[in-house]
């Protein structure tokens, strides 16, 4: 009987709800820190191992995902998706810009073990641009070893375009390697409850329970900014497109797409739900069959918010000054980073080091910021995915309805 129960228990742990397991890890970590401070400090090793695993897998993840995405792009797909693509890009940038404003209005700080004395902050936008350009020409092996994500992106894009001219066997190999790395990332993230248990325990034992308020404030800023985008920014963009009350469409998409995405925590997994909603709205099949999968890849407003808010929280913690041009550049960089976060649970968190590179923040400190993101990720990742996925179908519907209105008005004039 014992041998039959063990596999069942292991299967439940391996395939159970990650959100529930992280919640359990949070609660157990808080309890251990409250009961025994020495024991809580000792289990901090679990958190250290988890962060180390993230540091190891993040650079190769970015390289393979971007390279495979570009290499396997299909040629000759003729669909009328330019307005939708424009809305995707504009919405993602608007979300990053809103996150910058929100972060300046409600500044947050993090509890990081490294001091600001190890940081060499850039003096302004000129130095930031110089650092970006120099990072772009880094040796690819050196970029992978040192976590230079800007250099990794440049090499991934270049190799991706080069491989588009390769044969199908090569493209399939790159795609298989990308899937293998994604599997490794999922494997690491399955250990998130244990890692977060160690991180929460050691953090509370070291800094006290006041740390929870810092995380709570950060979570309020993140979720508040996502609500602002979902209920203010997106409706404005939809109104600009369809020129009528956008809220019936906005609320429908949040209810019938966002709720599902909140629990699945994957834009890719929510694609069938969005397809069904598009069919229910009588949208053009040739359009939404392309725009919905495309949106699951590049329409990442929630990810842009997460990257921007957590990066500026780290910058604020380390006392690095940020001028307006640098903040605007961060919005652009965060928007570009967000496009690489598709289909991976916690993907936006793993791309935070790229944005942190702008401010001279080391990879070690950046991965501590990622760890903080995992601690609050129970709600953050769910809200982020709900915003991302519901916006896919929202912008598709807005563009299709605007095109239908244009054709109808054109027919009336004739």
From Swiss-Prot:
Keywords, ordered alphabetically:
Amino-acid transport, Cell inner membrane, Cell membrane, Membrane, Symport, Transmembrane, Transmembrane helix, Transport
Classify the main location. membrane
- How does the entry describe its membrane topology? Multi-pass membrane protein
What molecular function does GO assign, one term?
neutral L-amino acid:sodium symporter activity
InterPro entries (UniProt xref): Na-dicarboxylate_symporter, Na:dicarbo_symporter_sf, Ser_Thr_transp_SstT
Gene Ontology CC terms, in alphabetical order: plasma membrane
The superkingdom listed in its UniProt entry is Bacteria
Q: Which GO terms describe its biological process?
A: serine transport; threonine transport
The subcellular location is: Cell inner membrane
Which regions span the lipid bilayer?
16-36, 46-66, 84-104, 143-163, 180-200, 218-238, 300-320, 332-352
Which PROSITE patterns does this UniProt record tie to the protein? NA_DICARBOXYL_SYMP_1
Task: Give the catalysed reaction(s), semicolon-separated.
Answer: L-serine(in) + Na(+)(in) = L-serine(out) + Na(+)(out); L-threonine(in) + Na(+)(in) = L-threonine(out) + Na(+)(out)
Give the Cytoplasmic membrane side ranges: 2-15, 67-83, 164-179, 239-299, 353-414
UniProt topological domain (Periplasmic) ranges: 37-45, 105-142, 201-217, 321-331
What does this protein do, in the record's words? Involved in the import of serine and threonine into the cell, with the concomitant import of sodium (symport system).
NCBIfam families in alphabetical order: PRK13628.1
Family assignment from sequence similarity: Belongs to the dicarboxylate/amino acid:cation symporter (DAACS) (TC 2.A.23) family.
Specify the protein name: Serine/threonine transporter SstT
Organism of derivation: Shigella boydii serotype 4 (strain Sb227)
Lineage of source species:
Bacteria, Pseudomonadati, Pseudomonadota, Gammaproteobacteria, Enterobacterales
Name of the gene: sstT
